[in-house]
Amino acid sequence: MVVRPPPARGRLPRPGRGPAGERDGAAGCGPRARGRALLATARPAGRRHAGAPGRAAGGGRVIELRDIGFAYGDGPPVLADVDLVIDEGELVLVSGPTGAGKSTLLGVVTGLVPRFTGGTLSGDVLLDGVSIVRTPPRERAHRIGYVGQNPAAGFVTDTVEEELAYGMEQLGLPPDTMRRRVEETLDLLGIADLRGRDLRTLSGGQQQRVAIGSVLTMHPRLLVLDEPTSALDPTAAEEVLATLTRLVHDLGVSVLVAEHRLERVVPFADRMCLLGGAGRVHVGEPGELLVTSPVAPPIVELGRAAGWRPLPLNVRDARRLARGLAQRLGSLPEVEEPAPEPAVAVRRLAVVHGETVAVRDVDLALGGGRVTALMGRNGSGKSSLIWALQGSGPRSGGRVSVDGTDPAQLTAAGRRALVGLVPQNAADLLYLETVAEECAAADGGTGACRQLLEQLVPGIPATQHPRDLSEGQRLALVLAIVLSARPRVLLLDEPTRGLDYAAKRVLAGVLRGLAAEGRAVLVATHDVEFVAQVADDVLVLAEGEVVSSGPVRRVVAESPSFAPQVTKVLGPPWLRVDEVVRRLAEQASAS
């Protein structure tokens, strides 16, 4: 058993270069100066770690968890009696409700828990047969690669190319090896055009790919990823998952990945770890566990409703099973809704960052009483547009009017009351010591914020420090804080990151309720399943311009990339499983 003290507030571990987050151990100049020179200047090679990623003498099992238990302080067990073996060349998916302990399980595997989190750990973790519980992190830094939920927190250099090379320099690899691996990784992840970009100018999805790439360059034996596709558009997510699959199948790298968007990862997984509460972990093949799992992708829920066996895990299998179902369901009646009065009017809005045009002469109107989804590839300008609408972000031209008022002309407090904004990095809005204090500051002690938080993610202790919450729990807290002010217009940037399916259904209901009160809601998201649940209208951005707009059923049906799973299986106008269930029930009662 190992007991570690918790880290000092504000000194969180940096996820990005191996289990310890210890990336500044090399002697000499600082990381930025070294990073700029390392690809152009020969230097002593130092210790070398040769060979392809994933390959080790003997192969076989890579990581083994034996009777693992973990708890924070005197709290209930987060993990209990966990046994898990990951073999070479295996992709294992970790799933479960928000706050069930997925990130903690990954932290135990990498050694971050309890070394950097505090808490009590029992049991043992073996890497290639050797215990890592009591060994220093530096001894496994090149063998376990880790990318956390906030990839930007691990960046220590200025540019993409420098960041990809930094970890290799700490391992003492020769410059020619570093150059080759950087080029291979840039091509592998499709980010060659970003090589010279400042990391601070990248979109969230671009940062995610750079963080993954910076780990891949070190050729780890085990790759541990916490929500790796949460900030990626559907196409980019497929590319990253295809890359991971190639590493698994061709190079024998083992991958352990925690993900809420099961529809993306389940088809690639060899096995699945399902955290079901009380610290218990169930391990098995995805098809077996998803039969009764409380968290399941839409395609599995559709299979349950239709009585298909075995349950489909991908769209191709579901389409084969669904032959005839679409005809039996018939069509949905088209409902003509009157155009609402615009709550937000935007004319020729432009945003420029340096030499990059992020938003290009955009015209749009957001109607009161409507939920509009803002979609597009990573880097298409969604976040820049949202910040410009709120009034805090820069504008290079154009006008924004919210009920006749330009938010940019208001004080910060005035803007927050008129236009609520949940940013992509929601934790930036948290600054107090406990969840209770954050809620009281948001609603003046009325209890409205806490009540909303309980609806989104039940059971978060009032005395918990916000920085100790999981990513999904922190997001839910920020959502409750912003929504408790009930602003006239609500803007949300990737609000479903870290949320399970149940929490997303609750969030969709909250947003629909706000829209029913006459508020305008704009949600920037890559989560096509959430769009199918909540949106009335969709705007699609490409290179800063609106390239498609209209009702959700028409826009998503036009785009294979943004279509939800039910639409891919049954075709338009079907978007959601609950629509299919309702129609089947109607037909059953009529027969």
What does each model-found stretch correspond to?
Residues 110, 390:
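Helix-to-loop junction immediately C-terminal to a conserved catalytic motif
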Residues 223-226, 490-493:
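Catalytic Walker B motif of ABC-type/P-loop ATPase nucleotide-binding domains
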Residues 259-260, 525-526:
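H-loop/switch region of ABC-family ATPase nucleotide-binding domains
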